[in-house]
């Protein structure tokens, strides 16, 4: 499981208000620009916990820890109703991490292709800069991997123009 902070899990409400359970005004602003999900008028993310799950999901993915990445996206996904852009994004990224896991850890490219096809369906219509993640690159790489799985070797997710990698201190956000 992945947590957004050292105290509460992603599914826990903030201040006991279920309607505000994805809001966290303490989450840092974007690394660059004003991506979809950032509200410049309030100076906060629309869903702070989604931003944190995305940051940690990207870091673990880029460290080659696809199962941990999957868990970060999946745990946050449960916070959103089906039919929302947030749900589609998170479900798609769960599939991306699972597909990379199939390819890298199991050399199962048929499984990877199946998961990436599903990921592309979920990510269709999600803005290219959703919560700072470069989804145009994600979609392009998933399509290319269908014919040439080796494009995944060394590929890293980019958020705010950077490709951050999990450090030892990031492990505090993973719980059993």
Q: What do these predicted ranges mean?
A:
Residues 1-176:
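Acidic, polar-rich N-terminal leader regions of halophilic archaeal proteins
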